[in-house]
């Protein structure tokens, strides 16, 4: 682009944007080894967790330094039990933070846990759905059960936390019917969430 007066005038303004959203890690890598994922192999596969008290301390310091109350957890997966521990820290402190992160479906996530997480300021959870077919999930080595998916999404939405689902079509041996089943499920979740 040539340096013209018009080009210089195109400097964006961010003054009307909401407050700063800062990235935070609570862990590195992922503890699972899904068949399709390159993260464990590309990064050495060593899952490391930071103590939740330290994560909360970092959030408080970022809040003090930059005035932000909004955090994006950029973990490959933020374990549900660790989300609950963070919620306990935030709720006990009385601080007003807002945050979101990505986790895995789990039998330990419950209505009570999602309510606690919502109360702490969580305003979105991203889940790696990948497929809504147990056979395909098993081939993917997701270590996930379809009944966990149903329960977690239902409880999360009922707590007031929107969900963002990642899914894929065309995993080796996946049938057309299985792919269409996953698409239908995601459409049902979308309709339920409205």
Q: Predicted segment positions?
A:
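Short acidic/histidine-rich active-site segments
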Residues: 166
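Ligand/cofactor pocket segment of small-molecule handling proteins
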Residues: 169
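Radical SAM [4Fe-4S] cluster-binding motif and immediate context
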Residues: 2-162
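Short catalytic/ligand-binding loop motif for oxyanion handling, primarily in non-cytosolic enzymes
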Residues: 80-82, 172-175
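Short, well-ordered amphipathic alpha-helices
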Residues: 8, 86-88, 182-191
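Glycine-rich phosphate-binding active-site loops on the catalytic face of alpha/beta enzymes
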Residues: 194
